[in-house]
Amino acid sequence: MTPVHFSFTSAFILGLMGLAFHRTHLLSALLCLEGMMLSLFIALSLWALQMEATGYSVAPMLLLAFSACEASAGLALLVATARTHGTDRLQSLNLLQC
């Protein structure tokens, strides 16, 4: 495994571990998701450059577009829950009460 592959794999795993273990605030969960998406975007971009395949160069742009949509939906949910519940703590959110 090259150092580049190791760094992007470790960045993805760190984002996944942060999402799994630091589940106190919604904003920290969204930041971990964004870190995972960023590492996937860079890894896909480098993979398309290494393979010199122009057909696969669309995939990183699609991933980036979906990542932006995910971030905007997450921030909208963050604002909505902060207005209704007064906090962004994930323990105060319950799907049965919302």
Curated annotation (Swiss-Prot):
It is an enzyme of class 7 (translocase). It catalyses: a ubiquinone + NADH + 5 H(+)(in) = a ubiquinol + NAD(+) + 4 H(+)(out). Signal peptide: none annotated. It is a multi-pass membrane protein. InterPro entries: NADH_UbQ_OxRdtase_chain4L/K, NUOK/Mnh_C1-like. The chain crosses the membrane at residues 1-21, 29-49, 58-78. GO terms for biological process: ATP synthesis coupled electron transport. Keywords: Electron transport, Membrane, Mitochondrion, NAD, Respiratory chain, Translocase, Transmembrane, Transmembrane helix, Transport, Ubiquinone. GO terms for cellular component: mitochondrial membrane; respiratory chain complex I. It comes from the Eukaryota. Core subunit of the mitochondrial membrane respiratory chain NADH dehydrogenase (Complex I) which catalyzes electron transfer from NADH through the respiratory chain, using ubiquinone as an electron acceptor. Part of the enzyme membrane arm which is embedded in the lipid bilayer and involved in proton translocation. Belongs to the complex I subunit 4L family. This is NADH-ubiquinone oxidoreductase chain 4L. It comes from Oncorhynchus kisutch. The gene is MT-ND4L.
